[in-house]
Amino acid sequence: MNKKALIVWGGWDGHEPEQVAGIFKTILEEENFDVEVANTLDVYADREKLKILDLVVPHWTMGQIEGTYVSHISEAVQSGVGLAGCHGGMCDSFRTNVDWQFMTGGNWVAHPGNDGVNYTVNIKILRANT
């Protein structure tokens, strides 16, 4: 039986949420996950569905979220559902929601050196032993 993942994308276009969600989807499918992709926060409304997932990958930047949605996803994570994300797609999702920040374990503050710093990102995929 495959593991189940949910990728939720949206918000500010600068972090290319749809494209990044597609990259995450491909990576997870190659690891034998069944992946659902949603571009609405309303998927967080179903508390019980969230709790049967193995992984949630938010990629939503600078948005607003219902308090009940944060409670639902937090409960799922507390019950053992994995949470993974990158950069501003996870920790800059909802700047004004402290509960989201506690759940993710971080908050976006600033780009070191400000914007415009050139850098290279290397993505290295390590395959799980099957």
Residue positions per predicted region:
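Short alpha-beta junction capping motif
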Residues: 4-10, 50-95
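Enriched - but not universal
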Residues: 12-15, 63, 103, 111
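Aromatic-Pro/Gly-enriched surface loop or interdomain linker
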Residues: 1-53
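A generic structural signal for well-ordered alpha-helical segments
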Residues: 28, 76-77, 100
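Glycine-rich loops and low-complexity Gly/Arg-rich segments
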Residues: 29-34, 60-64, 80-84, 108-112
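A structural signal for well-ordered alpha-helical segments within the folded catalytic domains
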Residues: 18-22, 67, 71, 117, ...
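An acidic, glycine-rich "communication" segment
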Residues: 89-130
